[in-house]
């Protein structure tokens, strides 16, 4: 990798990651967000994640968030903490991607669709549009039987 730094001046402290696109290799800078998620404290986790994304967005081509970064593994409050596809959090992620021109892989979120909550990963393009969505096949419904 040291040789690669010499070939790509201006990369600064964030080392490039090589991605094969089908048209050849492309160097990308990844902003991998690692954070202490406070279980059940959705607002604090979201605020902290956006602070961290703000710090790396000017250097990164793509930002990657961790699994269940909004609520951790707080399955007791899934009903009140689930995200809906059109809600403010989705809009904020979309706006950040578009504003910074950065791809965002939004880790996974508990997303509620049609009365079912699933662990869902979202990919936002540089234009802010959702480019990919994947929900794990197992829902959280069985964990919410006591609600």
Predicted regions and their residues:
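Active-site-proximal beta-strand elements of phosphoester/diester hydrolases
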Residues: 28-37, 120, 133
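N-terminal phosphate-binding loop and adjacent alpha-helix
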Residues: 34-52
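Cys-nucleophile CN-hydrolase/nitrilase-fold catalytic domain and related Cys-dependent amidase chemistry
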Residues: 42, 53-126, 133
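A short acidic/small-residue loop/turn micro-motif
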Residues: 136-140
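Conserved small/polar residues in nucleotide/adenosyl-binding loops
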Residues: 141-147
